[in-house]
Structures are given as structure tokens and as C-alpha cells.
Amino acid sequence: MDMVLAKTVVLAASAVGAGAAMIAGIGPGVGQGYAAGKAVESVARQPEAKGDIISTMVLGQAIAESTGIYSLVIALILLYANPFVGLLG
């Protein structure tokens, strides 16, 4: 009976951890929206620098999005390929 309880606790903690990992995806979304807004403001002020501004914004958003992708991968691992259940035996 103790093993069933242990697996239940591990699975519940993994679900909570996956939820926390997905909450971490909020940060990149807010940051990307802020960066896009500032890029639009910059293009409105200096239309001749549009190419440089857009390329810099896209590079920054690609780097910021990697955080969201990592949190998604961690959540999927915790939910579907949980390494901690195998440690219980």
C-alpha cells in the first residue's frame, strides 16, 4: 500500500510541476509583446531603419521564445515520460 501512495504523490507533484512550468511561459509572451510594441514605435519614428529594427526584434523574440519552449518540454516530460515513477520500483 505504501508504494501506491508513493506513486500517487509523485504523479501529483509532477502535475503541479508541469503546471508551474507552463506558468513560466507567461514571461516570454509578455516580453515578446512588449518588444514588438517598442519595435513598432521605433519604426514609426524612423521608417528608414525598418530593416534593422525588424531583424533585431525577430532575433530577440527567437531567443525569448526558447524559454517558453523549454518549459513546454519540461511539462511534457513530467506528464508523459515521468522519470521519477521508475525510481520507485
UniProtKB/Swiss-Prot annotation:
Entry keywords, A to Z: ATP synthesis, Cell membrane, CF(0), Hydrogen ion transport, Ion transport, Lipid-binding, Membrane, Sodium, Sodium transport, Transmembrane, Transmembrane helix, Transport
Record's GO cellular component terms: plasma membrane; proton-transporting ATP synthase complex; proton-transporting two-sector ATPase complex, proton-transporting domain
CDD domains: ATP-synt_Fo_c_NaATPase
Signal peptide: none
Transmembrane segments: 9-29, 68-88
Compartments where located: Cell membrane
Site (Reversibly binds sodium during transport): 65
InterPro entries: ATP_synth_csu_bac/chlpt (IPR005953), ATP_synth_F0_csu (IPR000454), ATP_synth_F0_csu_DDCD_BS (IPR020537), ATPase_proteolipid_c-like_dom (IPR002379), F/V-ATP_Csub_sf (IPR035921)
SUPFAM superfamilies, A to Z: F1F0 ATP synthase subunit C
Gene Ontology molecular-function annotations: lipid binding; proton-transporting ATP synthase activity, rotational mechanism
Entry keyword annotation includes Transmembrane: yes
Membrane topology reported for the UniProt record: Multi-pass membrane protein
Matching Pfam families: ATP-synt_C
Cell membrane found in the keyword field: yes
Alphabetical GO biological process terms: sodium ion transport
Function comment: F(1)F(0) ATP synthase produces ATP from ADP in the presence of a proton or sodium gradient. F-type ATPases consist of two structural domains, F(1) containing the extramembraneous catalytic core and F(0) containing the membrane sodium channel, linked together by a central stalk and a peripheral stalk. During catalysis, ATP synthesis in the catalytic domain of F(1) is coupled via a rotary mechanism of the central stalk subunits to sodium translocation. Key component of the F(0) channel; it plays a direct role in translocation across the membrane. A homomeric c-ring of between 10-14 subunits forms the central stalk rotor element with the F(1) delta and epsilon subunits.
Subunit structure: F-type ATPases have 2 components, F(1) - the catalytic core - and F(0) - the membrane sodium channel. F(1) has five subunits: alpha(3), beta(3), gamma(1), delta(1), epsilon(1). F(0) has three main subunits: a(1), b(2) and c(10-14). The alpha and beta chains form an alternating ring which encloses part of the gamma chain. F(1) is attached to F(0) by a central stalk formed by the gamma and epsilon chains, while a peripheral stalk is formed by the delta and b chains.
Family assignment from sequence similarity: Belongs to the ATPase C chain family.
Miscellaneous comment in the UniProt entry for this protein: The ATPase of P.modestum is of special interest because it uses sodium ions instead of protons as the physiological coupling ion.
UniProt name for this protein: ATP synthase subunit c, sodium ion specific
Gene expressing this chain: atpE
